[in-house]
Design a protein with these regions (language model features):
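N-terminal glycine-rich FAD/FM-binding segment characteristic of electron-transfer flavoproteins
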Residues: 2-224
């Protein structure tokens, strides 16, 4: 009988302004103060994929986000979906980070979590749409990358990923550990169940700062 590979999955999620509560100043800039927040929509698909792999093969799913203290809100929602662990990366030093500095900090968090099989990102954030954070993080980790994945299967110690494009599809096999970004087509995110909400309320949120991660301050925030 083929051995079942239990999955240790990290899902990186982002807090974005609630699109139903967007306000602009007189210069057309987004007013973030007092605006509600939500999980970046495609990051819910990333969470669902991680949870589905855990449910099928066993293992754990850790949700990670970088941001101010209020970013705990999206981590609570990840716990309510069924994640096993939630980690907030928060430090004033991280403020003003571009995708390069963000990817560096996220890679340090992945290393601190340790010995993971798969890191999953949504393919882009609705408030920026750079689609760079996942690839940059993979680069810092020195791991293979699959982008815009819309279907995935586990094959022993490897994953088989499919991505679609105009006129066809592409399938590739990648050894684990690996980093992938996913599109909304990969699945339909589950709803929060009362049981998962009750369970999630019992779980704490771990907070790591720059020193906890062992980051080089020169590579973080505006300096990075």
């Amino acid at each position: 009988m083929k051995e079942v590979h239990k999955m240790k999955v990290i899902v990186f999620i982002k807090q974005i302004p609630d699109s139903s509560d967007v306000k602009l100043d007189e210069n057309g800039n987004l007013i973030r103060s007092g605006v509600g927040t939500m999980i970046n929509p495609v990051d819910k698909n990333a969470l669902e994929l991680g949870l589905a792999l855990r449910d099928r093969f066993g293992g754990t799913v850790s949700a990670v986000t970088m941001g101010p203290p209020q970013a705990k809100d999206v981590l609570k929602r990840a716990l309510f979906m069924g994640c096993d662990k939630a980690v907030l990366l928060s430090d004033r030093i991280f403020g003003g980070a571009d995708t390069l500095a963000t990817g560096y900090v996220l890679s340090m968090a992945a290393k601190k979590l340790g010995d993971f099989d798969l890191a999953i990102f949504g393919n882009k954030a609705s408030d920026a749409e750079t689609a760079q954070t996942g690839p940059v993080t993979a680069g810092f980790l020195g791991l293979p990358l699959g982008t815009s994945v819309d279907a995935l299967e586990l094959d022993g110690n490897a994953i088989v990923c499919r991505r679609s494009f105009t006129g066809g599809t592409e399938t590739s096999k990648t050894a684990l550990p690996a980093v992938i970004t996913v599109t909304p087509a990969v699945n339909t995110p589950r709803f929060m169940t009362p049981a998962n909400v009750i369970d999630g309320l019992k779980k704490g949120i771990t907070v790591w700062n720059c020193a906890d991660l062992g980051c080089d301050e020169a590579k973080c925030g505006v300096k990075g």
